[in-house]
Regions:
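Gly/Ser/Thr-rich active-site loops/lids in small-molecule metabolic enzymes
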Residues: 126-150
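Polyanion-binding loop/helix "lid" in catalytic or ligand-binding cores
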Residues: 141-186
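Active-site beta-strand/loop microenvironment that shapes enzyme catalytic pockets
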Residues: 87-134
Length: 230
């Protein structure tokens, strides 16, 4: 399907997004003007995402939003997690940072939702062998707020452990920054490990450094005190 025709990153900028999966029809309004402005700003920040007005919303977006009962507008962003060459985890994380920076500059507040399962191998002889130990260890690092731990996984490890969809997680991690999740859940199955993380606590203020920078108006005083002390 369309999932195999994506560039690294694609934004939906049409007025609405529709789709269907397993008999369930999906429909959400899309803030196209915001989407186009976001594309422009991402270009200026060194990213070249594609954009579409007609792409269908599949289960990866439709199911999570349906379970959440979301009925407001949605700005779908598609990530090529499947077809090599895929974007690196570093690039996905930086893309998330650029999205957050752009939306903040635009004065837009939003909820970030990333969809992608942990280890699974659909269509292969490893379908019944999800990597539970790997998933558990990876999730433990995220539970501690170490979202940058995702950057340590290269394309070989992601492919070998069936975790190619963590590229979507890396995009969300870049947008969120280093934060401990409020909710962490892991639900293993015989063919696919499901995990969920959620953040709803406001970002804490940045703590003062033990060695703060010198305020410009205090340079002369600081220099004099240093000379007296030595």
């Amino acid at each position: 399907g369309d999932v195999y025709k994506r560039q690294a990153f694609t934004l939906h900028v049409g007025g609405e997004a529709n789709g269907e999966f397993a008999g369930h029809a999906f429909h959400w309004d899309v803030p196209g003007a915001i989407g186009l402005e976001l594309v422009r700003r991402l270009y200026r920040l060194g990213f070249d995402p594609a954009f579409t007005s007609t792409a269908k919303v599949d289960y990866a977006i439709g199911i999570p939003l349906t379970h959440l009962g979301h009925q407001g507008s949605v700005l779908p962003i598609f990530v090529n997690a499947y077809l090599p060459p895929q974007p690196t985890m570093e690039r996905c994380y930086a893309f998330g940072q650029a999205i957050a920076q752009s939306l903040t500059a635009m004065g837009v507040r939003t909820i970030v939702l990333a969809s992608g399962g942990m280890s699974h191998y659909p269509g292969t002889d490893r379908y019944s062998q999800p990597a539970l130990e790997w998933d558990t260890n990876a999730l433990a690092r995220l539970k501690d707020g170490n979202l940058k731990s995702l950057l340590g996984y290269d394309e070989v490890e992601l492919d070998d452990t069936g975790n190619i969809e963590l590229r979507c997680w890396a995009c969300a991690a870049g947008a969120l920054g280093q934060r401990k999740p409020d909710i962490v859940a892991l639900e293993p199955s015989w063919h696919h490990n499901y995990a969920s993380l959620g953040w709803f606590t406001p970002t804490p203020p940045v703590s003062d450094f033990h060695y703060p920078s010198i305020q410009p108006e205090l340079v002369a005083l600081t220099t004099a005190l240093h000379q007296i002390a030595h």
